[in-house]
Structures are given as structure tokens and as C-alpha cells.
């Protein structure tokens, strides 16, 4: 399933359409192990003084497709590399401020978003606000995961 990367058109799902941030500079997808890949990139933060931070996304072959950890929006060339690996079926958000691109993968691929219970998708630091995205499922230490023989340890 593909969609216009900045589309706000309905995906036909129960989730409201979103406007997505553009892809930023990143490297090639690198295979680390059989069924495990990694890609590094950067993010420019919209602050008074411009700040760049490094980002990374891990891709794991799961039970029924690819699982993305700490999603990072890829360029069209990067998405072609990702598509060559298989179908994206799940996105896992492990920590706060690591999910800004989760909605992009939900809209483009119909991926199910999983997030650690108690997290919120909010913009900005230190100022609670409305959630801009809701996961399809909240994860706890006892939740089933989309990777065979995987387990989750929740810290905090």
C-alpha cells in the first residue's frame, strides 16, 4: 500500500488522516544480522537555535512482516530499499519522542502501531498537550509481540 507521503487523505482505516513531516537525510539500510537491519539519519529540530540530532531505526523480520523500532521516515530511495526487504506490518515505539514518523508508516503500509503503555504522542518539550496519534495497541511486559520468541522488559 502506498500513499502520497504528505497526504492528509483518508486511508480507509479508523484512524484520522495526518500531515507528515518530510524525510530528512539518512544513510543506506545496513544488514546487521539475518533478519535485522539498521539505518542512521538526522533530524533538524525547529528551535530558536537550529539543532540537529542523530536518529536511528532498527528493522526486524517478524512473524508476519517487517517490524520497525523507533521509526524514521525514509526518502523515496530509502523506502524502495525497505520495500525490497518485505512488507512493513508493525511499528514499535519504545520511548517518548521516538514516534514522530509512526503515523507515516501506518498510512503508507497499514502498519499496526504498538507503544509502551503510558506514553503519549505530544509535540514539544515539557508542555502537555493533545495527543496527535493513538497506537493500535498498548504494550506491557506481558503483551504478545510480532517477533517470534521476543519479550519486552519495561523500565521505569
List each model region and its residues.
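Long, non-catalytic terminal segments
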Residues: 1-45
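Short, flexible loop segments at the rims of nucleotide/cofactor-binding pockets, characterized by
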Residues: 14-17, 45-49, 67-72, 90-93, ...
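Conserved beta-strand hairpin/beta-sheet module of binuclear metal-dependent hydrolase folds
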Residues: 27-77
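Conserved beta-strand scaffold positions in the cores of enzyme catalytic domains, especially
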Residues: 36-38, 91, 113, 152
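Short active-site-adjacent helix-start/loop capping segments
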Residues: 47-48, 68, 76-79, 99-103, ...
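Residues that flank catalytic or metal-binding motifs in active/ligand-binding sites
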Residues: 56, 109, 148
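Active-site metal-binding motif and surrounding structural segment of the metallo-beta-lactamase
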Residues: 73-116
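Metallo-beta-lactamase
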Residues: 117-156
Amino acid at each position: 500500500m502506498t500513499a502520497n507521503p504528505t497526504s492528509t487523505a483518508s486511508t480507509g482505516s479508523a484512524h484520522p488522516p495526518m500531515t507528515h513531516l518530510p524525510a530528512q537525510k539518512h544513510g543506506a539500510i545496513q544488514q546487521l544480522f539475518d533478519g535485522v537491519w539498521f539505518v542512521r539519519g538526522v533530524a533538524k529540530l525547529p528551535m530558536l537555535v537550529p539543532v540537529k540530532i542523530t536518529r536511528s531505526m532498527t528493522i526486524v523480520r517478524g512473524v508476519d512482516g517487517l517490524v520497525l523500532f523507533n521509526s524514521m521516515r525514509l526518502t523515496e530511495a530509502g523506502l524502495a530499499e525497505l520495500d525490497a526487504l518485505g512488507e512493513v506490518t508493525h511499528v514499535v515505539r519504545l520511548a517518548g519522542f521516538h514516534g514522530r514518523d509512526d503515523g507515516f508508516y501506518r498510512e503508507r503500509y497499514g502498519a499496526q502501531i504498538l507503544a509502551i503503555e503510558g506514553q503519549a504522542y505530544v509535540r514539544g518539550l515539557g508542555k502537555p498537550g493533545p495527543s496527535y496519534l493513538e497506537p493500535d495497541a498498548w504494550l506491557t511486559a506481558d503483551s504478545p509481540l510480532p517477533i517470534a520468541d521476543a519479550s519486552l522488559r519495561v523500565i521505569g
